[in-house]
């Protein structure tokens, strides 16, 4: 297939083999952009002829690192597919991708995939609705917007086609790792929300329709009072969107990601505003 894949890594020995082997049947070349991993990530990558490793210092966020990859990877294929190391295409979607790509018209410059979420080994089916993300695009036709986190793909022209291709986000690390990661995320999220509270953010028209809708929802969330908004958001996800049907793992996911994490973000915002008085 006329596809190159790009994966960003740092100490991903627990995930990288699964991700690479998932892509071997659909990608001519797999570029791994590694931030000087200290585990076995690089050694695992070297086992595969289709994989080309480029090491580059972490610039501070995913968007900058991926855009650097777009500028520096010797991509010769028509299409680029992006996956994180802890992600993979669902088995039934591998064949679908081959068929969809073969039938695309010239005006289609990007494809959105459906996110399948796993938490502590269980698929989370409720609470957020269908999440679509642009994960494949014609070479030279897209870049990530410059954001600290929650970055979305900007497609410069043409059509973004919604597909039924599914990709899984299935991280194998333990809950302690997840909590530590989100404590770090909270600092960046607080900076983004503080910025949104002081100005109206109009979603970029180069974003997909789904990304624009998500950005509008975040703009609304940013205007709800601190601490109340995380509580309301959890209730919305867990009760109204039936997150309670996802069992114990589902409760932990919706509570930790929907309420706890966002409360930590609000605490950081509150502390910052308090110091400004």
Regions of interest found by a model, annotated:
Residues 26, 47-49, 132, 156:
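Short, structured coil segments at secondary-structure junctions
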Residues 6-26:
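Short, well-formed alpha-helical segments that are part of the catalytic scaffolds
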Residues 42-72, 76:
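Conserved donor nucleotide-binding strand/loop of the catalytic core
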Residues 63-70, 83, 90-273:
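Catalytic-site signature of metal-activated, phosphate-bearing donor transferases
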Residues 78-80:
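Short aromatic/hydrophobic "clamp" motif used to bind/position activated sugar donors
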Residues 17, 39-47, 92:
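Acidic helix N-cap motif at the loop->helix transition within catalytic regions
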Residues 2-4:
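Cell-envelope/extracellular polymer assembly enzymes that use nucleotide-activated donors
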Residues 22, 34-43, 58, 84:
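A conserved acidic beta->alpha catalytic loop
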């Amino acid at each position: 297939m006329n596809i190159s894949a790009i994966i960003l890594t740092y100490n991903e020995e627990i995930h990288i083999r699964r991700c690479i082997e998932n892509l071997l049947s659909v990608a001519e070349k797999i570029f791994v952009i590694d931030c000087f991993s200290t585990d076995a990530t690089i050694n695992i990558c070297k086992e595969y002829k289709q994989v080309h490793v480029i090491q580059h210092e972490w610039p501070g966020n995913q968007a900058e690192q991926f855009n650097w990859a777009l500028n520096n990877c010797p991509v010769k294929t028509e299409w680029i597919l992006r996956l994180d190391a802890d992600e993979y295409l669902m088995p039934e979607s591998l064949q679908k991708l081959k068929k969809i790509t073969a039938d695309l018209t010239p005006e289609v410059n990007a494809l959105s995939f459906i996110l399948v979420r796993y938490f502590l080994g269980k698929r989370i089916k409720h609470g957020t609705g269908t999440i679509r993300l642009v994960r494949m695009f014609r070479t030279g036709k897209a870049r990530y917007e410059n954001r600290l986190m929650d970055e979305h793909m900007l497609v410069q022209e043409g059509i973004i086609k919604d597909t039924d291709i599914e990709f899984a986000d299935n991280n194998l690390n333990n809950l302690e790792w997840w909590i530590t990661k989100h404590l770090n995320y909270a600092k960046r999220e607080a900076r983004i929300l503080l910025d949104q509270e002081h100005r109206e953010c109009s979603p970029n028209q180069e974003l997909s329709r789904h990304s624009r809708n998500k950005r509008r929802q975040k703009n609304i969330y940013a205007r709800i009072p601190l601490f109340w908004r995380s509580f309301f958001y959890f209730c919305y996800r867990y009760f109204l969107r039936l997150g309670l049907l996802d069992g114990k793992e589902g409760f932990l996911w919706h509570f930790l990601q929907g309420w706890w994490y966002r409360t930590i973000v609000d605490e950081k915002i509150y502390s910052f505003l308090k110091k400004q008085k």
